[in-house]
Amino acid sequence: MKFLITGGAGYIGSTICSALEDAGHTPVILDSLITGRVEFTRNRIFYHGDIADTALVERLFSEHPDIYATVHCAALIVVPESVSSPYEYYQDNVSKSVEFFYTLQRLGYKRVVFSSSAALYDVVPDFMVTEEAPIKPISPYARTKFMMEMVLKDFCSAYGMKGIALRYFNPIGADPQMRSGIHVPVPTHVLGKLVDTAQGRQAVFEITGNEWPTRDGTGIRDYIHVWDLAQAHVKAMVDFGQVFERAGSPADGYLVINLGTGSGVTVLELVQAFEKVYGQEINKRFAPPRPGDVAGSFASADRAREWLHWKAELPIELGIADALKW
């Protein structure tokens, strides 16, 4: 089977491409390379351009009319940057995605898997969020993801599309075969900063916030190996129709599924696990929370297990080891 992956030259998109290939499928990549890496497209079908370039999208589908479903990963994803540069985030993540979704439905390619985020959840007392948990996106980045979920849901209702929004928790690690991994020069995510600190590119690792209402005062997250995350996308794409059947075939043609491990790890616990894998302590200190930070959450993973027939299997230590190796 053949699938379109927007943002397929990025960290998560490229890992999804590898997982598809390993399962015997063919990814077609559409990526602007503004943040993606051209080497992640090597030996793959690749279209260099923008998701809002209607002529390019039309040409892509005319040359690959057998595309079964689309995974929409293309987006800007840095929370603090979204606070300081909201225009770019709403332009890229919302305006262009609306155009892209409309082009998909106009061309008759109506199966969409959308890369959403757990960042749009409100904090709940026990930190475990189901897909029905209250929504409270507090950063422009999180709001763009929520807006696009609503757009996709409305398009499914109005135009007969079918959409699956996968709400990611905190991806870590790299492709276990080292075909791709995190590639930003200055990482903003916690594990990238730990690696940079361990390898001397960063002087000290800052634990942002130690007065959150968690068991040790540091933020709580659900760290999921990016390879597990990619496998969930393969399930969503290849078994697209069956996923809807398992979900009871909702009339609006739209599903939301959390992708996480189902267990919470605090930032301090992650640091301790990192030091154990790395074999020595790193320089660290507590610092105030960043703009847009929240105490955090972890996934209720029941729906993913029931509808996707998927669960996370790789331990946090492997995610750390793969990140260090990468």
Predicted features along the sequence, with ranges:
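N-terminal Rossmann-like NAD(P)+-binding domain of SDR-like oxidoreductases, especially those catalyzing
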Residues: 1-174
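Short regulatory "switch" loops immediately downstream of catalytic or recognition motifs
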Residues: 55-60, 173-176, 236-246
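Short capping/connector residues at structural and topological boundaries
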Residues: 84, 125-126, 134, 140, ...
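Short-chain dehydrogenase/reductase
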Residues: 90, 138-146, 180-188, 192, ...
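Mobile, glycine-enriched helix-loop/loop "lid" segments at the mouths of ligand-binding/catalytic clefts
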Residues: 175-176, 180-206
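C-terminal substrate-binding subdomain of Rossmann-fold SDR/epimerase-dehydratase oxidoreductases
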Residues: 193, 199-326
